[in-house]
Amino acid sequence: LDSEVVTCFDNSIAGSFERFTTTRDAVLISNNAVKGLSAIKLQYGLLNDLPVSTVGNKPVTWYIYVRKNGEYVEQIDSYYTQGRTFETFKPRSTMEEDFLSMDTTLFIQKYGLEDYGFEHVVFGDVSKTTIGGMHLLISQVRLAKMGLFSVQEFMNNSDSTLKSCCITYADDPSSKNVCTYMDILLDDFVTIIKSLDLNVVSKVVDVIVDCKAWKWMLWCENSHIKTFYPQLQSAEWNPGYSMPTLYKIQRMCLERCNLYNYGAQVKLPDGITTNVVKYTQLCQYLNTTTLCVPHKMRVLHLGAAGASGVAPGSTVLRRWLPDDAILVDNDLRDYVSDADFSVTGDCTSLYIEDKFDLLVSDLYDGSTKSIDGENTSKDGFFTYINGFIKEKLSLGGSVAIKITEFSWNKDLYELIQRFEYWTVFCTSVNTSSSEGFLIGINYLGPYCDKAIVDGNIMHANYIFWRNSTIMALSHNSVLDTPKFKCRCNNALIVNLKEKELNEMVIGLLRKGKLLIRNNGKLLNFGNHFVNTP
C-alpha cells in the first residue's frame, strides 16, 4: 500500500488484528480490549446515524487502536464527547436524568456542587441580554424544553468537539446570541470541575477532550467558581483572510481561479442574509486597521442596493459607524436605505463636491464574466472609482472596493499601493467565490514613496494566492459582536496646502492620526435626503 494511506481494520473480521500489526499506518476498531495496547475507549456507538449506548442489555464499548509510522500510538487519558445533537439528545446517566428533572437547588445539594458555579456554568443564566454559561449541550436541552428559547446549530462539521449554536429568546424573536458548548457526559464534567484548583482568580486550564487539549478559562472568587468556559478557536471565528505580503511581491502569470470549494454555501441562522454577514465581516476587519475615524466622518457606499430593493450593506455600515458619521450611498436601481443621503442612478454621473474619508464599493458588472478571450483589466465603473480616489478621497482616507476574478482594474491595483497599508480581504462567508475587497488604509497619494508593482501582475498574484490557500467557509464571527462598533479615534481634520505637507504631517497620515480635507458642511446632497436624525 501507499505509505500515505491509512487502513482501517474491523477486529470482528478474522485476521484483521494480524494485518493491523504489520501495517505501517492503520486503525483497528474492536469491541474487545487488546491486552498490552492502550486504546481510545468509547462507550457509545452510532446505529443508523443515531447514538446508542446499549445493544440489548449490554453496554456498547468500542476500543480504537492506532499505528503510525510502524509504531503503536500510546493514547492519553481523555474525556470524550457523546455524539448527540440538540434534536437527538437522550440522557445517558442517572446524573443527567436528575439534571433534566430536578429543581436546581436540590440537584446541586444532591451532588455537592455548591462551590462550583453550577447555576451559571451549566444551568445557565438567561436573565440578561447576553447569555451566561450553558457550555454543555444538556444545558440548552433543559432550558429549551422549558420554552425559554429556540436553538439552531450552525457549525458545519458535525464531528467537531467544540460546537456553536445560535440562541433566540422566545419573548424576543429578533435576538441572536451565540453559545459555545461541548457534549460531554455530565458525570465527566463534574469530575473535571471538582479537580480544579479554586484558589486562583483566573487561569487557563487544559482539558483533554477527544484526545486533544482544549483551553478553558476559569474565573474564581473566594474559592468559588464564577465562570468556566471553553475559549473560542480563532480560526473558526476569523471574519476573513487578508493577502499576505509574501504574495504581493511575486511575479505570477494570470491563471484561472480554481477554488476547491467553489460555489459551496454556508448555512446561515434564520433571519440573517449573506450580504449582512459579508459587510459585518468587512467592518470587523476594518476595526483591526489604522482607519481614520474623525467626528462627523464622511462615508460613500457604492452599489448599495440588494436584490430585494433594500440596502443591507448600508444598514450594517450605519450600525457600525459612529452615530455622528455621515453616510451617503448610491445604486443604479431604486432602493430603500438607512443612509443619511441616497442617490439613485449611474455612479459615473454622481457628482461629488466634497472629499470623503471612507469609500466602500460593492459594484459588480456581471457581463465581465461572459467576455470571450483573455481576462484583461476592465474599465466601466472602475474609471470613476479611480478618479474618486485621486480627487475626492481625503489624504489619510481609506477604501474597500470589491473585485473578482473577472471584475478588476489594473490602474486600481496600482493606485491601491499608494496607501500606507493595502491588502485584498476575503470575507469568511464568501470564500467559495473569487470575490475579495481591495483594502487601502491611509491614502498617501503622491506622497507615497514605495515602488509600485504593475496592476496586471498584482491581480495574477491575487489569483495565485486564492488558488493556493484553503479558506474555511464560515459566518461565525457575525455573532461575536461585543466589539463590533467602530469607535471615533479623534483623528484630526486639517485643510493644508501642498507646500505645508512636511515630514511630520506625512508621518501622522501614515499612522492614521490625520485627515487632510475641508472640514465644513457636506454639500450638494440636499435633494436626496432620506433620513432625519
UniProtKB/Swiss-Prot annotation:
Pfam families xref list: CoV_Methyltr_2, CoV_NSP15_C, CoV_NSP15_M
Catalytic center residues: 120, 135, 176, 278, 362, 402, 435
PROSITE patterns (alphabetical): AV_NSP11N_COV_NSP15M (PS51961), NENDOU (PS51958), NIV_2_O_MTASE (PS51955)
Protein name: Replicase polyprotein 1ab
Function, as annotated: The replicase polyprotein of coronaviruses is a multifunctional protein: it contains the activities necessary for the transcription of negative stranded RNA, leader RNA, subgenomic mRNAs and progeny virion RNA as well as proteinases responsible for the cleavage of the polyprotein into functional products.
Gene name linked to the record: rep
InterPro entries: AV_NSP11N_COV_NSP15M, CoV_NSP15_M, EndoU-like, NendoU_nidovirus, NIV_2_O_MTASE, NSP15_middle_sf, NSP15_NendoU_CoV, NSP16_CoV-like
Domain called AV-Nsp11N/CoV-Nsp15M: residue spans: 1-73
Keyword Ribonucleoprotein (UniProt): no
Coiled-coil regions listed in the entry: none
Site (Cleavage): 233-234
This protein's record includes keyword Zinc-finger: no
Protein source organism: Porcine transmissible gastroenteritis coronavirus (strain FS772/70) (TGEV)
Sorted UniProt keywords: Endonuclease, Hydrolase, Methyltransferase, Nuclease, Transferase
Nidovirus-type SAM-dependent 2'-O-MTase domain ranges (all copies): 234-530
Entry's Gene Ontology molecular function annotations: endonuclease activity; mRNA (nucleoside-2'-O-)-methyltransferase activity; RNA nuclease activity
EC number: 3.1.-.-, 2.1.1.-
The NendoU domain, residue ranges: 90-230
Biological process, per Gene Ontology: methylation; viral translational frameshifting
